[in-house]
């Protein structure tokens, strides 16, 4: 099978889009798929856009170059020009923009984690978009969905947005979760060894998130405090963002700041933190998917989170973690954590089950194999 992977950025750069196109491509290549990359497209905008963007800064509304019909039409021209010199079976994209106005003979496949209308009013920075940007974004998204033969989504939540908000026919909508965005060769033997290193007395929580409010950093601090007051020894490794000014950091919380997994030292540190933790604790208030939960499961690390966005497709209660409602009180978290620590064999079963979810569902080898078969059936 030969595919053309269309993207505005370089799919060979693991830093782009959290590494999703990079690891997606590697997964397909492991199944013998040959790729032609049509990437690093130029974002060409009309002069009027710059004027609108300037006016938007005054009004407080944002004109987005990412969601612009003129730019999307130009992307299509660039892609079409490069396609003329290629022989491929299908076109694959993980964002809608470059395929929204693409006319070609080959079937087009979109495999993404979210659609614009599903993010509007859900992710905070979308709320500042101007009316023109909202119109452009929905128009080009609808255009992309009308062109694709397959609309594949990483979660049931995203798939519902296609069906309910854009009226996409059920026949072309599929759900295939993304995988972990790093190299992992852990075996069940390895994970059992990791479990023997985790203390059955001191519970270690790991927070990974660059946004304090959206990722639920405040909840993590409150739960850690409650565990400490209840007499449960606790240690939190807090990675990504720093607490806001005025937030007291107790001695049982270690704030590491941002650690990049794209440099060897950072990756080694993150891997160490995941090996040592009992739970990944990221109670997000909004999340399109949550690759980090797949990555945690690769270490036999169960996840404590919330049932928002695409998380429900990744985390299954008492199988690879637990989801708590956004209005859950602190005691709900504490009771769950302490219950497992006091019956440690149950925790170990949960950790092994989490690794099984990674091995069977939440890895790129499995996911790309499923999508390859879907494309072959077109």
What do these predicted regions represent?
Residues 130-151:
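Membrane-proximal helix-turn-helix segments that form the acceptor-binding/catalytic region
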Residues 157, 179:
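Carbohydrate-associated surface elements
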Residues 240-279:
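Nucleotide-activated donor-binding/catalytic signature segment of Leloir-type glycosyltransferases, i.e.
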Residues 302-305, 315:
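Short hydrophobic beta-strand element within catalytic cores of glycosyltransferases
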Residues 339, 346-361, 370:
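A short, well-ordered alpha-helix in the C-terminal region of glycosyltransferases
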């Amino acid at each position: 099978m030969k595919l053309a992977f269309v993207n505005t950025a370089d799919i060979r750069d693991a830093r782009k889009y959290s590494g999703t196109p990079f690891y997606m491509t590697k997964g397909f290549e492991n199944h013998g798929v040959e790729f032609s990359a049509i990437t690093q497209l130029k974002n060409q905008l009309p002069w009027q856009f710059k004027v609108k963007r300037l006016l938007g800064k005054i009004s407080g509304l944002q004109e987005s170059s990412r969601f612009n019909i003129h730019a999307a039409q130009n992307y299509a021209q660039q892609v079409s020009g490069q396609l003329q010199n290629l022989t491929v079976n299908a076109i694959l994209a993980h964002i809608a923009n470059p395929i929204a106005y693409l006319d070609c003979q080959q079937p087009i496949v979109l495999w993404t984690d979210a659609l614009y209308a599903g993010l509007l009013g859900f992710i905070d920075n979308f709320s500042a978009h101007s009316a023109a940007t909202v119109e452009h974004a929905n128009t080009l998204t609808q255009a992309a969905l009308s062109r694709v033969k397959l609309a594949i989504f990483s979660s049931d939540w995203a798939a519902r947005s296609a069906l309910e908000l854009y009226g996409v026919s059920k026949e072309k909508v599929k759900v295939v979760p993304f995988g972990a965005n790093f190299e992992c060769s852990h075996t069940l033997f390895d994970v059992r060894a990791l479990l023997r290193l985790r203390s059955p007395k001191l519970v270690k929580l790991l927070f990974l998130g660059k946004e304090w409010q959206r990722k639920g950093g405040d909840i993590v601090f409150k739960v850690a405090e409650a565990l400490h007051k209840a007499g449960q020894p606790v240690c939190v490794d807090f990675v990504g963002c720093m607490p806001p000014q005025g937030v007291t950091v107790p001695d049982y919380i270690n704030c590491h700041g941002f650690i990049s997994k794209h440099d060897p030292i950072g990756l080694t540190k993150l891997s160490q933190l995941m090996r040592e933790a009992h739970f990944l604790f990221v109670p997000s208030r909004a999340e399109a998917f949550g690759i980090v939960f797949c990555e945690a499961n690769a270490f036999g690390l169960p996840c404590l989170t919330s049932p928002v966005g695409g998380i429900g497709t990744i985390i299954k209660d008492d199988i690879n973690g637990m989801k708590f409602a956004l209005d859950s009180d602190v005691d709900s978290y504490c009771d769950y954590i302490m219950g497992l620590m006091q019956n440690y064999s149950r925790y170990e079963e949960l950790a092994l089950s989490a690794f099984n979810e990674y091995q069977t569902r939440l890895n790129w080898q499995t996911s790309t194999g499923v999508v390859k078969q879907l494309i072959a059936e077109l």
